[in-house]
Amino acid sequence: MRAWVEQGFALDGVLAAGGGSAGAPVFSAFASGEFVLAHNEEIWRCLAETLENLRTHGAPSREMLWGFGNAVLCTIRRDDGAWLGVFTAPDLGDESAMAVRAKLDAFKQQDFAAPV
């Protein structure tokens, strides 16, 4: 899964990406220069816990957008426990936004039989 995210999200406007799956450690696939702190595993662990807490309490957390001052965080959670977080620039152009959307949709269908 990590290799797929590393390759698939090296897109214009994507600042960082990471994820995890049930029973596997979280990972940071990559982080751009201005978002280098996103390599910190604690960020992804906190995100995993937040998504799980939202799911546990009945919040509609399959697909969410989180707006911040300097970035937007897109999260996808699958039924099998796999999840993905992608930080993008807040002013993503149409072409980049469509490319990110296509990759997020592909993540929902991707078979990650191999370990993270």
Residue ranges and their predicted role:
Residues M1-V116:
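Non-catalytic interaction/Regulatory regions outside core domains
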